[in-house]
């Protein structure tokens, strides 16, 4: 027998996932330990007030790891990064804190494993989103991005 839902209530405010909470704590630690600027590869969270507070504390958010000066301190966001971005960060910076969410790390591991076993992988996500970019980069020949339908 189908269930009819008449009303859905959304909690306000909704909190961040555990991975983002961990990344926020890590970036807060970096702003306390290191003098500004501290760099963060991509915005730590899709929340303007949190990003603004970190910018006020001396964090510079970049969308290209090459924009981080040599010898700087950088955090990789909770959404995950491609292996190439992680390698470039470790090569050019003094300190790298990889704050990728453990659940994103698990997805990356599973994508690599399944690709190595010969599977074709369908990844449902949004083109250009940090999580999708990082995940697809783990096995680009094996992963096909599927954009969810809106509406």
Task: Please provide the spans of the model-predicted regions.
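The feature marks the mature, well-folded catalytic cores of soluble enzymes
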Residues: 1-151
